[in-house]
A protein has these predicted regions:
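Intrinsically disordered, low-complexity serine/threonine- and proline-rich regulatory segments
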Residues: 1-8, 94, 100-101
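N-terminal helix-turn-helix DNA-binding core of bacterial DNA-binding proteins
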Residues: 6-48
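Surface-exposed charged/polar residues within alpha-helices that form helix-capping/stabilizing sites
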Residues: 18-19, 82, 93
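Basic amphipathic alpha-helical segments that dock to polyanions
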Residues: 49-56
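Beta-hairpin "wing" of winged helix-turn-helix
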Residues: 57-69, 75
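Basic, amphipathic "hinge/linker" alpha-helix immediately C-terminal to the N-terminal HTH DNA-binding motif
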Residues: 69-88
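Amphipathic alpha-helical dimerization/coiled-coil segments
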Residues: 85-110
Length: 110
């Protein structure tokens, strides 16, 4: 069965939703949040950011709350919150699987 386009979020998508879970933000604030939250490990450029925002608007994961000239402010929707929480759970399951695999591997190699 083919997966829905937004079923699994990319790292950039995940962090954009994380930023908007905190508060409404404009694009530059989102990029700044991501860079600060990840200690510079993830830097999202304007092209990627606005592509993600466009997809999220289309899928109704976010909505525009304010438009001042070219500056747009975004807020997460209930659908976006659900997607963020589902992705968080998926990632936690991946981490648990990796930890269990590491434990099993260390037992075998002892």
């Amino acid at each position: 069965m083919p997966k829905k386009s937004m079923e699994i979020l990319t790292e950039s998508m995940f962090y954009v939703l994380m930023a908007l879970m905190k508060e409404t933000m404009c694009g530059m604030e989102i990029a700044g949040f991501i860079e600060k939250r990840t200690n510079g490990r993830v830097r999202i450029g304007p092209a990627t950011l606005y592509t993600v925002l466009g997809k999220f608007l289309k899928e109704e994961y976010i909505r525009e709350t304010e438009v001042e000239g070219r500056k747009r402010t975004y807020a997460i929707t209930a659908k976006g919150i659900q997607a963020y929480r589902e992705e968080t759970q998926r990632l936690l399951c991946c981490l648990r699987d990796a930890e269990e695999e590491d434990r099993e591997r260390s037992i075998v190699h002892e």
